[in-house]
């Protein structure tokens, strides 16, 4: 897959711990090192702690992975706040770090390049504005702009009780006038009720 990405001009791929089985840190390091021997595509080391095996990578393991020549970035989050912050502090001097753990203002102060968000799929102006304020050092204002949208957005998103991410992005895309397709099972589009669609349209109008 990495070779295909390289062939079609993709610059960067996410590399995380394996998904289905109990994760042993040395297993993760061994297989990512092996992949690197067969491709020149860039790696973004990804701590995928919130689904699948729920392996929450330690900063020590992340630091070993960014020593692999392909590694140029880290998509960093953690279920443990101490691990999250230590990851920011120790990885930022070495690679481009994309914040995947909240604390947008603080992470930007530490030197994160940007943050992960689904919102640009349907309302990019929201995150452009937040990022612009972060870059200007207007952190209080950035947090307010972020919270004013994200708190009601998260409330709506959490009411969509089914697996997956596309299933809650698609109705927002549709409300914004974009083509969104359908979800694959086990994600069930039927759980997005008319009331949820109404709440989505109301939020985007505001």
Q: What are the functions of these language-model segments?
A:
Residues 38, 49-161:
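Catalytic alpha/beta core domains of metabolic enzymes, predominantly
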Residues 153-187:
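Conserved short secondary-structure transition element at the edge of the structured enzyme core
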Residues 2, 94-100, 165-168, 174:
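Helix-coil boundary/capping segments in enzymes
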Residues 177-206:
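Flexible C-terminal active-site loop/helix
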Residues 1-56, 188-189:
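Active-site beta->alpha loop and helix N-cap motifs at the rims of alpha/beta catalytic domains
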Residues 3, 147-151, 174:
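Short amphipathic alpha-helical surface patches that mediate protein-protein
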